[in-house]
């Protein structure tokens, strides 16, 4: 993993920033300090930035120890657990059950990953290395799973007849939740067992870094509280490890759908609030455009700054349409 000089040595800020952030949070909830004001918000912003970079370090230590593609899976699973917890907490606390929260979160995650993160990585990597290669077999396989799940979850609900509106009937929702989890599980099996070589860097040999000890890995696992996947993907692309960058990005999107939908389905059925999953027409156009552009980008197995620019333009369109519908 790029950016790790000595996996056995932990920079002081890697533990100081999360500890200080936790202390500030505890003080806020105990009433010892006010909840608003520059005196609190400025240190909170600084500590959040420090915690993000600390998480990058801990995530890379763990990923370096377990190796690819397992490292990418660890990162994707960590952020998805946090994401699911936030969505479920919103659904349980909102008076109306926040039926569209899962849809908006999943759609935003797909657009941010496929266009924002991937576009930035391709642009940065292309500017530094001119042209980068990756294994098209693994990338297109992941994209195929992502496209299938995105269509089932975000587009098909608009065209079902059993329930009015962009929502599934309970039986349909259970089916989609089961196939989402099953297809994600099948993808993990292919990525880690059956065709693991599809997701490794081309020409990967021995790691250029010393492997961290089990003690160092356990220490980083305990401190890995959040996942700054965009930074991790960007650093991998900068280090000319585009396959790792794509594994992180696409794996994050797949985990978002494959794990979020089953979890929110259980909550939806438990509290009796139907999930609004179908996208509006304009968002469907952006999703289809993103999948189409990603197919062209990943099918070639080579990328330049041009592909990065295309994805960033689509991401900019998503931001504009979201701000000014």
Residue locations for each model-derived region?
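Hydrophobic alpha-helical segments, chiefly the membrane-spanning helices
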Residues: 1-325
């Amino acid at each position: 993993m790029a950016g790790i000089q000595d996996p056995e040595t932990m920079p002081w800020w890697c533990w100081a920033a999360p500890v200080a952030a936790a202390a500030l949070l505890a003080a806020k909830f105990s009433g010892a300090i006010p909840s608003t004001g520059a005196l609190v918000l400025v240190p909170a912003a600084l500590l959040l930035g420090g915690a993000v970079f600390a998480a990058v370090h801990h995530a890379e230590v763990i990923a370096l120890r377990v190796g690819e593609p397992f490292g990418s899976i660890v990162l994707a699973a960590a952020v998805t657990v946090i994401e699911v917890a936030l969505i479920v907490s919103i659904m349980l606390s909102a008076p109306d059950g926040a039926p569209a929260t899962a849809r908006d979160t999943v759609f935003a995650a797909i657009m941010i990953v496929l266009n924002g993160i991937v576009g930035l990585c391709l642009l940065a990597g292309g500017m530094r290395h001119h042209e980068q290669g990756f294994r098209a077999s693994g990338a297109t396989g992941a994209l195929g799973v992502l496209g299938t799940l995105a269509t089932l979850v975000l587009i098909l609900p608009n065209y079902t007849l059993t329930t009015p509106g962009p929502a599934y009937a309970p039986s349909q929702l259970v089916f989609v939740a089961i196939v989402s989890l099953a297809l994600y599980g099948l993808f993990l099996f292919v990525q880690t067992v059956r065709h693991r070589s599809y997701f490794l860097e081309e020409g990967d040999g021995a790691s250029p870094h010393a492997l961290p000890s089990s003690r160092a890995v356990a220490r980083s696992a305990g401190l890995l509280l959040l996942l700054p996947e965009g930074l991790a993907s960007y650093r991998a692309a900068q280090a000319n490890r585009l396959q790792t960058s794509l594994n992180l990005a696409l794996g994050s999107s797949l985990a978002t759908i494959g794990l979020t939908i089953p979890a929110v389905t259980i909550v939806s059925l438990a509290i009796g609030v139907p999930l609004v999953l179908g996208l509006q027409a304009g968002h469907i156009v952006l999703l289809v455009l993103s999948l189409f552009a990603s197919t062209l980008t990943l099918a070639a197995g080579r990328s330049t700054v041009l592909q990065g620019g295309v994805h960033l333009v689509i991401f900019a369109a998503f931001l504009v349409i979201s701000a000014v519908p």
